């Protein structure tokens, strides 16, 4: 199948799903504050919640260039799989965390693991697509990010209602 004309698009489709998950789980926290604050009272403070949101963004932003270097030196397929595994485990652990410090640490870890995905994913797409299809492939992949943002906010709103 790797030599077929459809395989590069299968890669985009698989990475689209990973991109969706990458953005969906990061978005959910912002709409689940009230539900989480019931169990973790420190989250009732806007400053503490801001720190929780900020630690992810700062670490994600600082890690992105490093993630690019790591992606250039490692097998990108396995880097993506490992990143997906770690951030999925972190998402689960955040659901059972009991303290603000646990959630803060997990949010920082999520920033590291999610930062590893985008450089590796885009590079992998570039490996499979020539100049004729590369921009379209990346554009399709990017819709996974935006769909994940939308579903993450919507899904968390529904979860918060129950």
Predicted segments, located by residue:
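Residue-level signature of mid-helix packing/kink "hotspots" within the transmembrane helices
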Residues: 27, 57-65, 115, 149-150
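Conserved MFS/SLC helix-loop-helix module at the cytosolic interface between two early adjacent transmembrane helices
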Residues: 62-98
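Glycine-rich segments within core transmembrane alpha-helices of 12-TM secondary carriers
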Residues: 135-156, 160
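Extracellular/periplasmic helix-loop-helix junction of adjacent transmembrane segments
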Residues: 32-62
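Extracytoplasmic
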Residues: 10-44
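Cytoplasmic helix-loop-helix junction between adjacent transmembrane helices
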Residues: 106-144
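Interfacial helix-cap and linker-helix signal at transmembrane-aqueous boundaries
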Residues: 36-37, 70-71, 155-162
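Helix-breaking motifs and short loop linkers at transmembrane-helix boundaries and internal kinks
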Residues: 41, 75, 96-102, 129-130
């Amino acid at each position: 199948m790797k030599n077929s004309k459809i395989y590069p698009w299968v890669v985009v489709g698989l990475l689209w799903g990973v991109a969706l998950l990458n953005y969906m789980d990061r978005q959910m926290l912002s709409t689940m504050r009230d539900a989480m604050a019931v169990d973790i009272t420190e989250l009732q403070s806007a400053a503490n919640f801001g720190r929780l949101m900020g630690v992810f963004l700062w670490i994600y932003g600082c890690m992105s260039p490093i993630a690019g270097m790591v992606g250039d030196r490692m097998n990108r397929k396995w880097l993506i799989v490992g990143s997906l595994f770690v951030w999925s485990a972190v998402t689960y652990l955040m659901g059972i965390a009991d303290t603000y410090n646990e959630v803060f640490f997990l949010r920082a870890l999520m920033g590291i693991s999610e930062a590893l995905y985008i450089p590796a994913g885009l590079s992998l797409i570039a490996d499979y697509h020539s100049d004729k299809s590369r921009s379209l492939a990346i554009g399709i992949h990017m819709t996974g990010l935006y769909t994940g943002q939308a579903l993450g906010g919507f899904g968390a709103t529904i979860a918060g209602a129950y």
